[in-house]
């Protein structure tokens, strides 16, 4: 059975968020870099940087937390893996779902690269739905 790097990324971010961690370290892959770029651009994470440690590269993400008197609380976003190795989910550009009426983001893998649902609708291309973020 192979590794599903995208599920590992989602699980790492979700677990760090529930544990109220400030940073999370994920392995560096091209898919991870593209998804982190989208998360950063959409404002779901605060910062991302690359860290190299003995021939291995990692992405260190700084999560965006709300502050209150008791310390950091959970962020206000959720991640859900949609298409998985056992059941791939594809959609053309007309049927790409709107997450929370446009408040959330769907991340797609298209022939033109990894992009958000809004970008895919504007470019009129469909693809595999990787994640929902709301």
Curated annotation (Swiss-Prot):
Q: Superkingdom of this entry's organism? A: Eukaryota
Pfam families from the UniProt entry: Ribosomal_S8
Give the SUPFAM superfamilies listed for this entry: Ribosomal protein S8
Tell me the GO BP annotations in alphabetical order: translation
Name the principal localization, coarsely classed.
Answer: plastid
Q: What InterPro entries does the annotation carry?
A: Ribosomal_uS8, Ribosomal_uS8_CS, Ribosomal_uS8_sf
The GO cellular component terms are: chloroplast; ribonucleoprotein complex; ribosome
Location comes to: Plastid, Chloroplast
Is the keyword Nucleus assigned to this protein? no
The entry's keywords: Chloroplast, Plastid, Ribonucleoprotein, Ribosomal protein, RNA-binding, rRNA-binding
Please provide, alphabetically and separated by semicolons, the GO molecular function terms listed in this UniProt record. Answer: rRNA binding; structural constituent of ribosome
Family the UniProt entry places it in: Belongs to the universal ribosomal protein uS8 family.
**What is known about its subunit structure?**
Part of the 30S ribosomal subunit.
The protein's job, in short, is: One of the primary rRNA binding proteins, it binds directly to 16S rRNA central domain where it helps coordinate assembly of the platform of the 30S subunit.
What name is this protein filed under?
Small ribosomal subunit protein uS8c
């Amino acid at each position: 059975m192979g590794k599903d790097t995208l599920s590992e990324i989602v699980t790492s971010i979700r677990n760090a968020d529930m544990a109220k961690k400030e940073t999370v370290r994920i392995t560096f892959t091209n898919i991870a870099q593209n998804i982190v770029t989208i998360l950063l651009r959409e404002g779901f994470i605060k910062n991302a940087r690359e860290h190299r440690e003995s021939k291995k590269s990692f992405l260190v993400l700084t999560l965006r937390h709300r502050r209150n008197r008791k310390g950091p609380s959970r962020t206000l976003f959720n991640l859900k893996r949609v298409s998985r190795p056992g059941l791939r989910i594809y959609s053309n550009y007309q049927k790409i779902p709107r997450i929370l009426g446009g408040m959330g983001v769907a991340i797609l893998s298209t022939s033109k690269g990894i992009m958000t649902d809004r970008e895919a609708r504007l470019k009129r291309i469909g693809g595999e739905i990787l994640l929902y973020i709301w």
